[in-house]
């Protein structure tokens, strides 16, 4: 009888271990996470020991340590379950990042594909191997052929969480506002069109797919690329089937943001979820009102630029900071 009791208890415990109660999804622009090695295939010369930044091993080590500190307590005081990143030079810098002492215990894994971006920076995806298994991933290059520019790929990652549900993650870093937001708008519209095509392709084969979109969009929730081209909803209760709900609309309306430019906050870093993550409350779904910008006093500058995110460099002056963007996150629950 005791043997049967132990067997039943073991089965129950094993099942409980495979239930995903809560998970955090975050995005962080890591601002020029370059190693110190010259790379002939990208324009990274400033981030070398001989370059204008005098970027050496000490600076690189400090950068990794600083970013790991933020990530380690990013989502409600802990490391996120899923983390999209941008402005990384290669897979090696992500491997160095997750190997930091404060992150090693998270047992993270990486998805990364080199992109043709002119600055030599890519997007990436970091996830906890104990929670998520990647099934496949693809990179999609926005069509900027009309301008002869090359930008970051949009990364689509598909996999299963431990309870068996399939999740899709799409990580973005859209073209910058260099030259002005209006002059560069067409490039972000091209990126939005590519993202919309990815969504349509997923839903064609999996109509009830659960999709999470994240990134530095270099546009805000109310801008044309997001509000019109992607047709993203800012009203959770009225999000139609096939639409994305932008969890950061209300934060933009409140005058807050993830990037401070000329003393004005811009909500450039966002996370959106498909309608299926709003309606299916008997499975993994978006936790209402969980959208958050991670901001701590120690992540911000003091003095002349008080309140600005504490970045690695101000021009060519080394500040030993974190990033010029603040990270964002949402919560999922089951």
Question: Residue spans of the language-model regions?
Answer:
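Active-site-proximal beta-strand/loop segments in catalytic clefts of secreted hydrolases
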Residues: 28-31, 86-89, 112-116, 128-129, ...
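Metal-dependent phosphoester-hydrolase catalytic domains
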Residues: 200-211, 219-334
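Extracytoplasmic, non-cytosolic globular domains
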Residues: 112, 155, 159-250
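Second-shell loop/turn segments in exported
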Residues: 51-58, 79-85, 112-113, 143-145, ...
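Structured beta-strand-rich core segments of catalytic domains in phosphoester-bond hydrolases
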Residues: 88-174
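Extracytoplasmic/secreted cell-surface and envelope-processing proteins
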Residues: 36, 92-95, 119-122, 178-181, ...
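N-terminal, active-site-proximal structural segment of metallo-dependent hydrolase catalytic domains
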Residues: 15-101, 107, 111-115, 121-123, ...
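Bacterial Sec-dependent N-terminal signal peptides
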Residues: 1-21
């Amino acid at each position: 009888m005791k043997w049967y009791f132990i067997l039943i208890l073991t089965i129950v415990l094993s099942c409980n271990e495979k239930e995903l109660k809560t998970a955090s999804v975050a995005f962080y622009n890591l601002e020029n996470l370059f190693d110190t090695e010259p790379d002939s295939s990208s324009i990274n010369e400033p981030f070398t020991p001989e370059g204008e930044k005098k970027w050496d091993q000490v600076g690189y080590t400090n950068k990794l340590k600083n970013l790991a500190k933020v990530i380690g307590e990013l989502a409600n005081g802990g490391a996120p379950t899923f983390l999209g990143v941008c402005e990384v030079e290669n897979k090696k810098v992500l491997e160095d990042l997750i190997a930091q002492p404060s992150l090693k215990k998270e047992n993270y894994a990486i998805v990364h594909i080199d992109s043709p971006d002119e600055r030599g920076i890519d997007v990436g995806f970091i996830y906890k191997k104990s929670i998520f298994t990647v099934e496949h991933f693809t990179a999609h290059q926005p069509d900027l052929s009309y301008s002869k520019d090359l930008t970051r790929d949009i990364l689509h990652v598909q996999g299963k969480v431990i309870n068996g549900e399939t999740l899709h993650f799409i990580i973005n870093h859209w073209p910058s506002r260099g030259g002005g937001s209006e002059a560069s708008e067409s490039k972000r519209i091209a990126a939005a069109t590519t993202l919309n095509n990815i969504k349509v392709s997923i839903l064609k084969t999996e109509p009830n797919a659960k999709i999470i979109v994240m990134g530095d969009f270099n546009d805000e929730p109310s801008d044309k690329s997001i509000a019109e081209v992607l047709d993203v909803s800012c009203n959770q209760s009225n999000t139609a089937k096939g639409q994305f709900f932008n969890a950061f609309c209300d934060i933009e309306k409140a005058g807050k943001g993830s990037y401070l430019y000329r003393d004005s906050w811009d909500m450039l870093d966002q996370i959106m979820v498909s309608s299926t993550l709003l309606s299916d409350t008997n499975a993994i779904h978006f936790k209402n009102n969980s959208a958050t910008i991670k901001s701590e006093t120690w992540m911000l500058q003091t003095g002349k630029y008080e309140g600005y995110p504490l970045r690695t460099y101000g021009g060519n002056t080394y500040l030993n900071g974190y990033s010029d963007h603040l990270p964002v996150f949402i919560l999922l629950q089951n």
